[in-house]
Amino acid sequence: ANEWSQNANMSVRWWNQRIADYGGGFIFLLYLADHLGGGPAVRQLVQSTAQGAAAIENVARSPVGASPGVIGTDFRDIYANFTIAATLDSDQGIYGLSNLYMTPACGSSDFCRIQPAATNSDWTTPYSSTGNSVEGWGVRVFKFTPGSASSAPLTMRFTGDVPGMDGVIMSRAISDGTYTRS
């Protein structure tokens, strides 16, 4: 699983027999089981006549042991919520996994969260990160902290090389630690 957590730019949907493919698939199925009703939800997924994203969407819309749509109703939202959970492993509902403890840093014997491609806390000059390739349905995580800079609005721009690339921004409230997705 850590091979994918350290290389989450690799797709969860494309299967190329890489160790990371097994790790990403394992964590994704644990996430679906955790939030959609456990073993019965996985059974529902495996028995579905639909394939790929459509099968996952069907289970999410009519789960055996959870509220419909709890993690989203289309694959884009389901995948975004999964990658947030695999990055944060928060105890804030869908942004974590209760059936797997994930450590912030990768070690030899622990499962780890998605590792950031880059971090930044120096805002004395503009920050830029280039050359971050991502396979379809892969993810790149960047961690930004305020550092010693005074509070100011943060402007972000994402430029993808391919149409249809999407991004999600998660922010954490200083007052209570609650995460917000935008």
Q: Predicted segment positions?
A:
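Beta/coil-rich, acidic/histidine-enriched accessory regions frequently appended to metallopeptidases
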Residues: 51-182
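Acidic/His/Gly-enriched intrinsically disordered linker/tail segments
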Residues: 1-35, 46-86
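Loop/turn elements at helix/coil->beta-strand transitions in domains of secreted/extracellular proteins
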Residues: 36-41
